[in-house]
Amino acid sequence: MSHGEEKEPGIPQKVDSIDEIFVGCKSWVLKDGQDRLAEILSINSRRDPPKFYVHYEDFNKRLDEWITADRLQIDKEVIFPRPKELEEKKDSKKKKQQQNKSATPQAASATPDGGDVMDLDNLNVQGIPNEDISREDEIKKLRTSGSMTQNQNEVARVRNLNKVIMGKYEIEPWYFSPYPIELTDEDVVYIDDFSLQYFGSKKQYERYRKKCTLRHPPGNEIYRDDYVSFFEIDGRKQRTWCRNLCLLSKLFLDHKTLYYDVDPFLFYCMTRRDELGHHIVGYFSKEKESADAYNVACILTLPQYQRMGYGRLLIEFSYELSKKEGKVGSPEKPLSDLGLLSYRAYWADTLIKLLVEHGQEITIDEVSSISSMTTTDILHTAKALEILRFYRGQHVLYLNSDVMKRYKKLKNNKRRSIDPQKLIWTPPVFTASQLRFAW
């Protein structure tokens, strides 16, 4: 569906009982003392009374939940989906219209060298394509990527685990993750803090914990300060551990869809140390060979450690690796909503600090070289900060009073940061056979 089109509304009807409601209907649901419209995504009739899995209209998917029947407001009209025959006719009509549209030749660009001109008003840092992609086209375009979004229909919409216990933390998952189906009937799933192995019962977990000797991610420790450590793990060498990490992260990342083939990736895990060992706080993955110059494929801070500044450390560390490699980089798009906010804040603070402390004229390319940020990300950030001006026939960066105030705040902020001197790392080099996917 294109952005300009509205989805056809359903058919509102009164119902006499809960039994008339099925998957695809929209009903009013009592949430936090208010009635909210929600779509029924799944019904669990194995339980008595049955439970309904709902998605609230205009709310993020992470708020989807299982509810009991008493929260459904059946005294109000229920919106039923339109009959399938009507939908199919409408879809075929749309397809014909799209085919006719694509057959119409497009007007030539008014700019002769359009490839060298950057449209500053339409910089798309989120990287989400605007056109619709059919299932067949999507499969053709599919590549082994850590965070590629697939069509909504291809991603399971029902969260399948209710609760996860990881170390001393009890966590409620946000999204579906393809754990073994036998775990989905368990009220609680136990995940080992070090090996990330999963268990359906506490007894199984405790027996495993007595035997397992792993106390840190199974890779090389490449960074350590008095606060955090970073480990580099090769997906090809540690497949089981990396797959477990991807399954865990899928619980909290909506558009992470490829989790099985970890061979083409390196994983950089941030940990906190205590007397028991290194506990994973967050991670980012990175393609061993990225054709698009991405320096991050997936990035996640586990929910129990969010809002503590760890996400920013992960982002900063990814750029420190890019500096060591002598490359510019950018995260793979699209970013999650939380990821985009974190990156925008990091880009803005980095750009402001660099411009103020440099103290003299500097080009965008020089800013890119020093920070390892791409010119697109720099321009997008400058535009968001409203410091990009057109002066005497060229674009210049103008430091206004708001930027100077933000810089003073940055200077007074005692935020933790990565110490480049403590990064003991040489960029890995891979042969063609090492980069080959192991199918």
Swiss-Prot record:
Modification N6-acetyllysine, positions: K256
Keyword Ribosomal protein: no
Catalyses which reaction(s): L-lysyl-[histone] + acetyl-CoA = N(6)-acetyl-L-lysyl-[histone] + CoA + H(+); L-lysyl-[protein] + acetyl-CoA = N(6)-acetyl-L-lysyl-[protein] + CoA + H(+); 2-hydroxyisobutanoyl-CoA + L-lysyl-[protein] = N(6)-(2-hydroxyisobutanoyl)-L-lysyl-[protein] + CoA + H(+); (2E)-butenoyl-CoA + L-lysyl-[protein] = N(6)-(2E)-butenoyl-L-lysyl-[protein] + CoA + H(+)
CDD domains: CBD_ESA1_like (cd18986), NAT_SF (cd04301)
Any single Gene Ontology cellular-component annotation: nucleus
SMART domains: CHROMO (SM00298)
Subunit details: Component of the NuA4 histone acetyltransferase complex.
The protein, known as: Histone acetyltransferase ESA1
Entry's EC annotation: 2.3.1.48, 2.3.1.-
UniProt superkingdom: Eukaryota
Region (Disordered): 83-120
Annotated catalytic residues: E332 (proton donor/acceptor)
Site (Important for catalytic activity): C298
Free-text function comment from the UniProt entry: Catalytic component of the NuA4 histone acetyltransferase (HAT) complex which is involved in epigenetic transcriptional activation of selected genes principally by acetylation of nucleosomal histones H4, H3, H2B, H2A and H2A variant H2A.Z. Acetylates histone H4 to form H4K5ac, H4K8ac, H4K12ac and H4K16ac, histone H3 to form H3K14ac, and histone H2A to form H2AK4ac and H2AK7ac. The NuA4 complex is involved in the DNA damage response and is required for chromosome segregation. The NuA4 complex plays a direct role in repair of DNA double-strand breaks (DSBs) through homologous recombination.
Main location: nucleus
Tudor-knot domain sequence ranges: 23-73
Organism: Kluyveromyces lactis (strain ATCC 8585 / CBS 2359 / DSM 70799 / NBRC 1267 / NRRL Y-1140 / WM37)
Motif (ESA1-RPD3 motif): 239-260
Entry PTM: Autoacetylation at Lys-256 is required for proper function.
Entry text on domains: The ESA1-RPD3 motif is common to ESA1 and RPD3 and is required for ESA1 histone acetyl-transferase (HAT) activity and RPD3 histone deacetylase (HDAC) activity.
Keywords on record: Acetylation, Activator, Chromatin regulator, Chromosome, DNA damage, DNA repair, Nucleus, Transcription, Transcription regulation, Transferase
Subcellular location(s) per record: Nucleus; Chromosome
Gene Ontology MF terms: chromatin binding; histone acetyltransferase activity; peptide 2-hydroxyisobutyryltransferase activity; peptide crotonyltransferase activity; transcription coregulator activity
